[in-house]
Amino acid sequence: MSDSITNPENSEIQTNYDKIVHKFDELKLKEVLLRGIYGYGFVDPSAIQQRAILPIIEGHDVLAQAQSGTGKTGTFSIAALQRIDESIKAPQALILAPTRELALQIQKVVMALALHMDVKVHACIGGTDPREDAEALRAGAQIVVGTPGRVFDMIERRNFKTDHIKMFILDEADEMLSSGFKEQIYKIFTMLPPTTQVVLLSATMPKEVLDVTDKFMNKPVRILVKKDALTLEGIQQYYINVESEEYKYDCLSDLYDSISVTQAVIFCNTRRKVEELTKRLTDDSFTVSAIYSDLPQAQRDTIMKEFRTGSSRILISTDLLARGIDVQQVSLVINYDLPNNKENYIHRIGRGGRFGRKGVAINLVTDRDVGDMRELERFYSTQIEELPANIADLFD
């Protein structure tokens, strides 16, 4: 089950660190951790794991450019579990993620890998009772996975003692730093021991990310996927020119009449559009779930569970879902709207082809969107083809 379909070839990776590890056994990991890795279904390290786990274990600051589906969660989870001192019952590794869903996903992976270890992993996220966080932190959680707002709050209230923190890992750093978390993240940096190792993972390297590396990282090992390697392999990308906004729904209906798809994710740019589309599809007898950031956490969890178990066939979402949620049976992603943020395109279409599955991404494009689509093609060095007439063949 290695999450490595988008492994770039070694020639497509630029790095200032020359050690490559081809087998997990070569990393000299704790025996109990190795059992967890193989038990989880990892066989061999993905390209990013071959290069990034070792420098993290060695204590270097690491800046890794990797998008969803490359095995990056396994990379920092394995390294953190190797570095943790199980006898110290206090937070030693702090992992930040931009959304609650991604934080919970990471927590699940860390706990699965730590199955045979005496390690407590706590998710410190908004939408839950802060008293539960305080209790879990007091009870000796050694790895804390959280969202910036809640983590900052817990540290500020002195419920989260940072004296033993040795690793600070920022996942999806580009998303966090562009989503208004920058100030909180900077403050968290200042509340950690000065010797804390910093590991930063990001699909793209905008100025905000590079500023953090300059300010808070010490001679980082850089593992950067070349720009033109950022398109997800295994995803066939198409567009339909719908001319104008009012024709999008009819186009979507026609699409569903033409193809047989087990499950699909449809992305819209606003909550209002998610709600409108959900209502129209439901009125037309489709089984639909909708998810967006304002929903209470319990409701979001229920919706994701329904979709994962297959009781809902269509999930309509804002970009909340675009990062890090593993829904393995999804073969089709539809961008009802092109994303406002170019970086989110890769996360959206990456839903469809994780874990070696092929996926199809279809973009509904108005005449006004054509320029933005061409810009996406340039940005990712890719081609988005017009959807062919024999579209049913794509889903055989």
Curated annotation (Swiss-Prot):
A motif (Q motif) lies at residues 22-50. It is found in: Cytoplasm. The keyword Endoplasmic reticulum does not apply. It is an enzyme of class 3 (hydrolase). InterPro entries: DEAD/DEAH_box_helicase_dom, EIF4A_DEADc, Helicase_ATP-bd, Helicase_C-like, P-loop_NTPase, RNA-helicase_DEAD-box_CS, RNA_helicase_DEAD_Q_motif. The keyword Glycoprotein does not apply. Pfam families: DEAD, Helicase_C. One of its GO terms (biological process) is cytoplasmic translational initiation. It catalyses: ATP + H2O = ADP + phosphate + H(+). Residues 234-395 form the Helicase C-terminal domain. Keywords: ATP-binding, Cytoplasm, Helicase, Hydrolase, Initiation factor, Nucleotide-binding, Protein biosynthesis, RNA-binding. Component of the eIF4F complex, which composition varies with external and internal environmental conditions. It is composed of at least eIF4A, eIF4E and eIF4G. ATP-dependent RNA helicase which is a subunit of the eIF4F complex involved in cap recognition and is required for mRNA binding to ribosome. In the current model of translation initiation, eIF4A unwinds RNA secondary structures in the 5'-UTR of mRNAs which is necessary to allow efficient binding of the small ribosomal subunit, and subsequent scanning for the initiator codon. Belongs to the DEAD box helicase family. eIF4A subfamily. This is ATP-dependent RNA helicase eIF4A. The lineage of its organism: Eukaryota, Fungi, Dikarya, Ascomycota, Saccharomycotina.
